[in-house]
Every structure is written in structure tokens, then in C-alpha cells.
Curated annotation (Swiss-Prot):
GO terms for cellular component: fungal-type vacuole. Binds 2 Zn(2+) ions per subunit. Keywords: Aminopeptidase, Hydrolase, Metal-binding, Protease, Signal, Zinc. Residues 1-18 form the signal peptide. GO terms for biological process: proteolysis. Zn(2+) 2 binds at residues 196, 235, 340. Its EC number is 3.4.11.-. It comes from Saccharomyces cerevisiae (strain ATCC 204508 / S288c) (Baker's yeast). The lineage of its organism: Eukaryota, Fungi, Dikarya, Ascomycota, Saccharomycotina. Its cofactor is Zn(2+). Zn(2+) 1 binds at residues 177, 196, 262. Belongs to the peptidase M28 family. M28E subfamily. It holds the Pfam family Peptidase_M28. One of its GO terms (molecular function) is metalloexopeptidase activity. This is Probable aminopeptidase YDR415C.
Length: 374
């Protein structure tokens, strides 16, 4: 591995020499593959479908370049069967697709949610204000909203934290990224980002609304802490979530489970509707539990699928030693082909399909919120 490390470092040095006048970004594009490129080349990689972590701010955490040196994801015991069906079903029946449509219409009305743009900051402000309104009746000793600032860009991540009553140190996280991008000209062209990832954001907002209305307002508290994360700058190389989970790792937080919702609204074939369970670069035991939730609460089946390295924000969790899982709208080959363009619009999406993803979130936070036999 030491020879391989020297080879990678040599490649980084060569690339850096080739672009002497541009600020360079350090990208991890594989488990043992790192490159240093200018910002313009970073965008070209995205256009070619190359996924990566932008670890420029976190180079001290690179595994040099040995996967065995990365933090180990613990093996936890997740519930072998569901135990809160009545509570979950009571919440599911109140999913409001009209409210989801209204929120997604507003969220996609921003010209772009590109994390470096003023529009991206404005969309984060709207999202934070809407979340605050959803949760306004919950006391601060139960629920808090954190604006997680990032030094290099204006759009902030949002963390909604419901503090556990018994074991607040055990954390369950539901994630989605709030930013969008037009890969043709990110700083100039519109990026409505309805599916990527307005759909996942609104899916989680609706779950938060129902959790607030049907659970928290009735005086119930989870035993474990439940958090909703709305990440900035996923499209820039998982920048926002990498900041968040790197901070959590440094603080030695106990994240027991993280579920990512990214692209939840597109159905390519209504006669073959399903959700996709990502099985690569995720945590198998947690993924199996998510399958249990789907079988228990959804009206459509799941299919296993693969998404590749650094596919979405769950990768930032597993990279930092936390269990991560990812549910997407379908098998990867059948996902929305209009993303990252002006054509990723609300009219192409199914609110009913998004509602199925909301059911997953409700099942996870209610079932794991009360679980203790880790």
C-alpha cells in the first residue's frame, strides 16, 4: 500500500504542476484514488458522470490511501421486526400530497439553488423559515434548529434536532441535500432541481411535519435523538455533508443510523413502480432494516440497485465511521435523466411516489427512535 500511496501522491503533484495559476481542489474519486484539479476540471468530471468527495478542507483525514485506515463502521443490532405499526400507520394516513406539491412548487421557483449563488442562499433561508414554522409549537428543550455554516460558501446546511428523552447520545439521522445544479453553466443557467433534490427535501419536510403533528405535539418524545439534515453543496462533491459528519466524528457523536433521501419523485414506468435500495457503499445491516420498513409500510416493492462511489450524502456518513443507507426513486438505470438541467421540473414527478418515500422516513424515525438494543 505504501508504493500505491507514493504513486497517488506523484499523480497529485503532476496535476498540480499542470495548473500553476488556478486554485486547486483535492478530490477523492475512489477508495484509493485521489486527484488535485482546478475548479473548472471538477465541473468537467461531474459532466462525465464521475462522482467524488471534495476533501480539500479535509486532507488530513485522507486515508493515505489505504482503505483499512478509514474509520470502521460499527455493526449495530437493528430491530428484527416492527413494533410501532399503529403509530406509524396513524401518521402515514395523514400524508398531505397537496402540501408537498405547494412546498416543491415554491422550492423549484428559485432560479437555482446552486450553493455558490445568492439564489442558493435565498432558498436555504426559505427552507429554514418553513421548517421553523412547521415546528414552531415545539419547545426548545425538545427541538432545535441549527444553521450549520460553511466557510467557503454562503448556503448553509440545516439541522433539525429532536433531543431524545432517555438516550440522547444515540442519534438517528434523516438526510437530504437542498442544493441544485445546472451542469452546463452552473453560475448562469436555471436549475429548478425538482427531482434532484427538491423531491427528497420535500419528502423529508413532510415527514418532519407529520412527526411534529402526530408525535411531538401529543407530548411524545423519542428515546433516542432524531435529526433531520438538509445539506448544502452536495453537488459540489458532498461538501456540506462532509463538513457535518467530519465535525460529528471529531465530537465523537454516536450516530446509530443515517438514511439519505435523494431523488424520490420520478417514475419511469407506472406499471413497474418501485423504490431502489442502494446496496453498494452502504451499511448492510441498516440496509436490511430499511427493507423491513419498506415491506411493512409501503404499497410498492423495493429493488436492490447500485449507485457507485461518493454517490450521495450517506457516503459522508460511512466515510466518517457512521452507518449509512440510501433509498432512491427506482433502480438506478431507471432514474430521472432530466436532472442537472432546466428540464428537472415538477410536472415530471409523482407526488404519490414521493409519499411512499415519506412513509419510509416515518417508519425509520419512529421505529429507531424508541430502539435501545443496539
Amino acid at each position: 500500500m505504501r508504493i500505491q500511496s507514493l504513486f497517488v501522491l506523484f499523480n497529485v503533484a503532476i496535476i498540480a504542476w499542470s495548473y500553476p495559476y488556478e486554485p486547486l481542489r483535492v478530490l477523492q474519486v475512489g477508495e484509493n484514488e485521489v486527484m488535485e484539479v482546478p475548479e473548472s476540471e471538477k465541473l468537467n468530471l461531474r459532466r462525465r458522470g464521475v462522482k467524488f468527495f471534495d476533501v480539500t478542507k479535509h486532507t488530513s483525514f485522507l486515508p493515505f490511501f489505504n482503505k483499512e485506515e478509514e474509520p470502521t463502521v460499527p455493526t449495530y443490532n437493528y430491530p428484527p421486526e416492527i413494533s410501532n405499526k399503529e403509530v406509524v400507520d396513524d401518521s402515514i394516513k395523514n400524508i398531505d400530497k397537496g402540501s408537498m406539491h405547494k412546498n416543491l412548487a415554491k422550492f423549484t421557483s428559485f432560479y437555482t439553488r446552486y450553493y455558490k449563488s445568492d439564489h442558493g442562499f435565498e432558498s436555504a433561508e426559505w427552507l429554514a423559515a418553513t421548517i421553523a414554522n412547521i415546528t414552531k409549537d415545539i419547545p426548545q428543550d425538545t427541538l432545535t434548529i441549527e444553521h450549520f455554516d460553511h466557510k467557503e460558501w454562503k448556503q448553509y446546511s440545516i439541522i433539525v434536532r429532536v433531543t431524545g428523552s432517555t438516550t440522547p447520545e444515540d442519534i438517528i439521522i434523516i438526510g437530504s441535500h437542498q442544493d441544485s445544479i445546472n451542469l452546463l453553466l452552473p453560475s448562469i443557467m436555471a436549475a429548478p432541481g425538482a427531482d434532484d433534490n427538491g423531491s427528497g427535501t420535500v419528502t423529508n419536510m413532510e415527514a418532519l411535519r407529520l412527526y411534529t403533528e402526530n408525535f411531538l405535539k401529543r407530548g411524545f418524545r423519542p428515546n433516542n435523538t432524531v435529526e433531520f439534515h438538509f445539506y448544502s453543496a452536495e453537488e459540489g462533491g458532498l461538501l456540506g455533508s462532509l463538513d457535518v459528519f467530519t465535525a460529528y466524528a471529531k465530537q465523537k457523536k454516536h450516530v446509530r443510523a443515517m438514511l439519505q433521501q435523494d431523488m424520490t419523485g420520478y417514475v419511469s414506468d407506472p406499471e413497474d413502480e418501485h423504490v431502489g435500495i442502494v446496496t453498494d457503499y452502504t451499511t448492510p445491516a441498516l440496509t436490511d432494516f430499511i427493507k423491513l420498513i419498506i415491506n411493512s409500510y409501503l404499497s410498492i416493492p423495493y429493488r436492490d440497485t447500485q449507485c457507485g462511489y461518493a454517490c450521495s450524502d450517506h457516503g459522508s456518513a460511512t466515510r466518517n465511521g457512521f452507518p449509512g443507507s440510501f433509498v432512491i426513486e427506482s433502480e438506478f438505470k431507471k432514474t430521472n435523466k432530466y436532472i442537472h438541467s432546466t428540464m428537472d421540473t415538477l410536472d415530471r414527478l409523482s407526488l404519490a411516489h414521493m409519499a411512499e418515500h415519506t412513509k419510509i422516513v416515518l417508519g425509520v424515525i419512529i421505529e429507531l427512535g424508541s430502539w435501545s438494543a443496539w
